[in-house]
Curated annotation (Swiss-Prot):
SUPFAM superfamilies: Class II aaRS and biotin synthetases, SufE/NifU. Transmembrane segments: none annotated. It is found in: Cytoplasm. (R)-lipoate binds at residue 134. HAMAP family: LplA. It comes from Escherichia coli O17:K52:H18 (strain UMN026 / ExPEC). The keyword Nucleotide-binding applies. GO terms for molecular function: ATP binding; lipoate-protein ligase activity; lipoyltransferase activity. It catalyses: L-lysyl-[lipoyl-carrier protein] + (R)-lipoate + ATP = N(6)-[(R)-lipoyl]-L-lysyl-[lipoyl-carrier protein] + AMP + diphosphate + H(+). Monomer. This is Lipoate-protein ligase A. InterPro entries: aa-tRNA-synth_II/BPL/LPL (IPR045864), BPL_LPL_catalytic (IPR004143), Lipoate_ligase_A (IPR023741), Lipoate_protein_ligase_C (IPR019491), LipoylTrfase_LipoateP_Ligase (IPR004562). The lineage of its organism: Bacteria, Pseudomonadati, Pseudomonadota, Gammaproteobacteria, Enterobacterales. NCBIfam families: lipoyltrans (TIGR00545).
Length: 338
């Protein structure tokens, strides 16, 4: 019986693909070597310890229907589209060794005619007339008895969109999360015009087989049928939840300020695990009572635009004469935290 397992996903859903990855990783035998190939439609993928409000332009993502997905490995934020090929290598310990999986990817690129090399802790670069350019980034996860190495290869990604979603709004965030380091990147199509996702997957697969001296049939994972993986439904529900993708953000503080015709407002939030743990409101409004009441209501509230808007509008019952001001405030807060 082969020790290899090859899985290829037909889904472009990042939550689906990351749930598949997690389920395979948790239940794989210690003697198995796994290669999982996949890609995501428009998504910002953040590291396990990152703060999405700091890393991403969450408002622009919402406008453009770009998903946010938190992965279980560390590292920085990346933008995925269908111009990226994603790979995951898994193995039990002590065999797990990220230098092996890195060499498999380098061998695959070499077979395609691209000479690349490892750079730093987790990048693959090619040499160009303008200097080294990154074509692949990776992240890693290890438990007591197993490990995985996953990464992306830039085939024909829309690099102009990176800045749309990975450059955050100028929010006044004093965050404790890990800030992504931006690198100069290039697409493989600059070196191999017309290269496709299927060709890259085939090259990685062949390099994987060659390294281990075995072949195995690919298992196609399709969103049309629930994968036959232990606890997949629960894992997918968690991976796609607001609580995981946003609520797992490290503790941070957020300062919002705005001047309205009726006065200036300054809001100070402390946020932990996606909930407001402290809210302070400062204003020079001639009628500060609704704002003072709002500070109390926001304590414990989810740091989510619709929930904050709901708390603002709930004050209309007690302060009907301030309806105009409260609706302006509600719209501003909801827009500011998206």
């Amino acid at each position: 019986m082969s020790t290899l397992r090859l899985l290829i996903s037909d889904s472009y859903d990042p939550w689906f693909n990351l749930a598949v990855e997690e389920c395979i990783f948790r239940q794989m035998p210690a003697t198995q070597r796994v290669l999982f190939l996949w890609r995501n439609a428009d998504t910002v993928v953040i590291g396990r310890a990152q703060n999405p409000w700091k890393e991403c332009n969450t408002r622009r993502m919402e406008e453009d229907n770009v998903r946010l997905a938190r992965r279980s490995s560390g590292g920085g934020a990346v933008f995925h589209d269908l111009g990226n090929t994603c790979f995951t290598f898994m193995a039990g310990k002590p065999e797990y060794d990220k230098t092996i999986s890195t060499s498999i990817v380098l061998n695959a690129l070499n077979a395609l005619g691209v000479s690349a090399e490892a750079s730093g802790r987790n990048d693959l670069v090619v040499k160009t007339a303008e200097g080294d350019r990154k074509v692949s980034g990776s992240a890693y996860r290890e438990t007591k008895d197993r490990g995985f190495h996953h990464g992306t290869l830039l085939l024909n990604a829309d690099l102009s969109r990176l800045a749309n979603y990975l450059n955050p709004d100028k929010k006044k965030l004093a965050a404790k999360g890990i800030t992504s380091v931006r690198s100069r990147v290039t697409n493989l199509t600059e070196l191999l015009p017309g290269i496709t996702h299927e060709q890259v997957c085939e090259a990685i697969t062949e390099a994987f087989f060659a390294h281990y001296g075995e072949h195995v049939e690919a298992e196609i994972i399709s969103p049309d049928k629930t994968p036959d993986l232990p606890n997949f439904a629960e894992t997918f529900a968690r991976q796609s939840s607001w609580e995981w993708n946003f609520g797992q953000a490290p503790a941070f503080s957020h300062l919002l300020d705005e001047r309205f015709t009726w006065g200036g407002v300054e809001l100070h939030f402390d946020v932990e695990k996606g909930h407001i743990t402290r809210a302070q409101v400062f204003t020079d409004s001639l009628n500060p009572a609704p704002l003072e009441a709002l500070a109390g209501r926001l304590q414990g509230c989810l740091y989510r635009a619709d929930m904050l808007q709901q708390e603002c509008e709930a004050l209309l019952v007690d302060f009907p004469e301030q309806e105009k001001e409260l609706r302006e405030l509600s719209a501003w807060i909801a827009g500011a935290v998206r």
